[in-house]
């Protein structure tokens, strides 16, 4: 266990991960942040680490654009993305190439600072759920040890059933509460595949013990999240 339970009242943290890289995590994080902000929650996003860029995190900049706000002071001072690497690879390798180390407590302290200022922090991961942050620490294990709930981004493209079920199984084995699946329809080519994949994923949520988690569509008009969906994400029934 990396972290001790804190008793200080602070903002909630939700982790955002995906079944693969390039699945739409950044867009989903920004749009979810906007949805929560519009319902009255003071919301900020954070990127656990970013590779392949310099200066301000490109994903954080995209979040702000989608939220309809300017870059914040916490973006410019690195709080919302404590680790930036030029080398475009998994964080553990990018850090090695640049002769640096990722300290999980540096990330945690940055999140604490944001929790003191906001009601809700959406923490976007890197790549998929099992991407290593360091040679010893996977993103999923970081989320588990921090006690965060998780929003998982899936998609309608071929192969998503396998990747999604593997991710749900990894969460179930670790005791990570899956709060929602965002179903990215930008990838769909055949409506029969898209519709069936969504049905299989919804059934899998129940099978793995996440039956209260909504499946929210992402399409060209944005997120199809209803106020009730947002409430279930933040305050799951029975918890």
From Swiss-Prot:
E.C. number(s) listed in UniProt: 6.3.3.3
Residue numbers binding Mg(2+): 26, 59, 124
GO terms for cellular component: cytosol
Pfam families per record: AAA_26 (PF13500)
Gene Ontology molecular function terms on file: ATP binding; dethiobiotin synthase activity; magnesium ion binding
Entry keyword set: ATP-binding, Biotin biosynthesis, Cytoplasm, Ligase, Magnesium, Metal-binding, Nucleotide-binding
Superkingdom assignment: Bacteria
Catalytic activity of the protein: (7R,8S)-7,8-diammoniononanoate + CO2 + ATP = (4R,5S)-dethiobiotin + ADP + phosphate + 3 H(+)
Pathway as given in its UniProt record: Cofactor biosynthesis; biotin biosynthesis; biotin from 7,8-diaminononanoate: step 1/2
Biological processes per GO annotation: biotin biosynthetic process
Compartment(s) where it occurs, according to its Swiss-Prot or TrEMBL record: Cytoplasm
Required cofactor names: Mg(2+)
Binding-site positions, ATP: 22-27, 59, 124-127, 184-185
List of catalytic residues: 47
Binding residues annotated for substrate, in chain numbering: 51
Keyword Nucleotide-binding belongs to the record: yes
Primary location group: cytoplasm
Complex formation: Homodimer.
UniProt xrefs under PANTHER family: ATP-DEPENDENT DETHIOBIOTIN SYNTHETASE BIOD 2, DETHIOBIOTIN SYNTHETASE
The family this protein is said to belong to: Belongs to the dethiobiotin synthetase family.
Function summary: Catalyzes a mechanistically unusual reaction, the ATP-dependent insertion of CO2 between the N7 and N8 nitrogen atoms of 7,8-diaminopelargonic acid (DAPA, also called 7,8-diammoniononanoate) to form a ureido ring.
NCBIfam families (alphabetical): bioD
Protein known as: ATP-dependent dethiobiotin synthetase BioD
Provenance organism: Chlorobaculum tepidum (strain ATCC 49652 / DSM 12025 / NBRC 103806 / TLS)
């Amino acid at each position: 266990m990396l972290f001790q339970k804190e008793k200080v009242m602070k903002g909630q943290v939700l982790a955002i991960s995906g079944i693969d890289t390039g699945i739409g995590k950044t867009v989903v994080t920004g749009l979810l942040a906007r949805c929560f902000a519009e319902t009255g929650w003071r919301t900020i996003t954070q990127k656990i680490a970013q590779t392949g860029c310099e200066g301000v995190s490109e994903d954080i900049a995209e979040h702000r654009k989608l939220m309809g706000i300017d870059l914040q002071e916490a973006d410019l001072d690195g709080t919302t993305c404590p680790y930036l690497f030029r080398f475009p690879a998994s964080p553990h390798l990018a850090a090695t190439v640049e002769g640096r180390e990722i300290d999980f407590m540096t990330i945690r302290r940055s999140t604490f600072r944001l929790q003191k200022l906001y009601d809700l922090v959406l923490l976007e991961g890197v790549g998929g759920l099992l991407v290593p942050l360091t040679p010893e620490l996977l993103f999923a294990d970081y989320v588990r040890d921090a006690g965060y709930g998780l929003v998982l981004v899936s998609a309608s493209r071929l192969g998503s059933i396998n990747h999604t079920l593997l991710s749900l199984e990894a969460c179930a084995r670790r005791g990570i509460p899956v709060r929602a699946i965002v179903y990215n329809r930008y990838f769909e080519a055949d409506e029969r595949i898209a519709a069936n994949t969504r049905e299989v994923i919804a059934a899998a949520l129940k099978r793995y013990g996440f039956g209260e988690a909504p499946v929210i569509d992402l399409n060209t008009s944005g997120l199809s999240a209803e106020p009730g969906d947002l409430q279930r994400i933040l305050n799951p029934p029975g918890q």
